[in-house]
UniProtKB/Swiss-Prot annotation:
First and last residue of the signal peptide: 1-20
Pfam families named in the record: Fimbrial (PF00419)
Parts forming coiled coils: none
Identification of the protein by name: Protein LpfE
Subcellular location: Fimbrium
InterPro entries found in the cross-reference section: Adhesion_dom_fimbrial, Adhesion_dom_fimbrial_sf, Adhesion_dom_sf, Bact_Fimbrial_Adh_Pro
Length: 175
């Protein structure tokens, strides 16, 4: 019995030290993190662009669909670090007669709409027509000009003269 009492504390000491020791339950694992850090994308040269369409003479008979007074304008981008593509969306009221064109502000000429296309001929549609943004290649050294052409387009044979202003908002996303 004395041997059993002496053996019991010795076993408890061995058990306690075994429980305190860390145990290896398998090999160590690795966690890999992947991240790309980019500088800010392009900045707009101007938040607002004014295009002077000058005076248009509406000839009779009106030629529906004929582009009048084409005027060049551009959206300027600068400091385009790491951006290779800019996608432009334009939002304005679609013309009720031809929703692929932008409506003029009310209170002026009627039966006339505004057409916007790139210098390469790709038309920019009002975003409310579920159009696809127009893509442009951008270069990260220097200033980029996204070149466009605006023109008035008669959409009705009984178009009337008057003020022909339009407001079109644009947004640019980058990749």
């Amino acid at each position: 019995m004395k041997n059993l009492h002496a053996l019991m504390p010795a076993c408890l000491l061995l058990t306690a030290s075994a429980m305190a020791a860390p145990s290896n339950i398998g090999s160590a694992g690795d966690i890999h993190f992947t991240i790309t850090i980019k500088a800010a994308t392009c900045e707009l040269e101007n938040d607002s662009i004014d295009v002077n369409m000058e005076t248009v003479v509406l000839q009779r008979p009106v030629k529906v669909g004929k582009e009048l007074n084409q005027k060049n304008f551009s959206i300027g981008l600068k400091d385009c670090a790491y951006a290779t593509k800019a996608s432009v969306t334009m939002d304005g009221s679609p013309d009720p007669t031809d929703p692929s064109l932008f409506a003029l502000d009310s209170g002026g000429a009627t039966g006339v709409a505004l057409k916007i296309k790139t210098s390469g001929g790709e038309q920019q549609y009002p975003s409310s027509t579920d159009s696809t943004p127009v893509e442009h290649t951008v270069w990260f050294d220097g200033t980029n000009k996204l070149n466009y052409i605006a023109s008035y387009v008669p959409v009705k044979p009984d178009a009337t003269v008057g003020t022909a202003n339009a407001t079109v908002n644009f947004s640019v996303t980058y990749e």
